[in-house]
């Protein structure tokens, strides 16, 4: 028997959950990336440009001027336009990546599919930038694993020998939330 309050449709059938999902209206607002994330990325751009100018000046042997970073002010309409354009771009990129994965009889996309989709879309200039960001992200993950392993060693929780990366392979690793819940066992380690 269906939950209380469900009504039969015109054919006399109770709606199923998939039927209910089809009836929901999905708007563009539901699909947009969070405004805070988009604005944080937008505010990084002037800082990155300033760093690039300083690096280029240092390579040429020119004196490097250290100017304070300019504050970026983005209006509400501009932030909404950034949200919409970022969402459309990422969905378009994912569509191409899915097509490339489908051509190779795979159901999921991997990093190579995304990078090849950038070329396929006509944005080969973004490929090195995305690859560099991905490398930075993977390095940050490795650093986090190593820091976690060092904390386990200092806390006396490690029972195994470290692998070649200096980390430990545990099947039942504790989550970061569990580590945060036990502050009396943590030691501060500065990188």
Curated annotation (Swiss-Prot):
Compositionally biased residues, Basic and acidic residues: 182-191
Acidic residues: compositionally biased ranges: 172-181
GO MF annotations in UniProt: DNA polymerase processivity factor activity; double-stranded DNA binding; nucleosomal DNA binding; protein heterodimerization activity; single-stranded DNA 3'-5' DNA exonuclease activity; single-stranded DNA binding
UniProt region (Disordered), positions on chain: 154-191
Places the protein is found: Nucleus
Native source species: Candida glabrata (strain ATCC 2001 / BCRC 20586 / JCM 3761 / NBRC 0622 / NRRL Y-65 / CBS 138) (Yeast)
GO biological process, one term: heterochromatin formation
One CC-aspect GO term: nuclear replication fork
InterPro entries: DNA_Pol-Epsilon_Subunit, Histone-fold
Name used for this protein in its record: DNA polymerase epsilon subunit D
Task performed by this protein: As accessory component of the DNA polymerase epsilon (DNA polymerase II) participates in chromosomal DNA replication.
Extra facts: In eukaryotes there are five DNA polymerases: alpha, beta, gamma, delta, and epsilon which are responsible for different reactions of DNA synthesis.
Source organism phylogeny: Eukaryota, Fungi, Dikarya, Ascomycota, Saccharomycotina
Domain of life of the source: Eukaryota
Keyword line: DNA replication, Nucleus
Oligomer status and interactors: Heterotetramer. Consists of four subunits: POL2, DPB2, DPB3 and DPB4.
Keyword Nucleus: yes
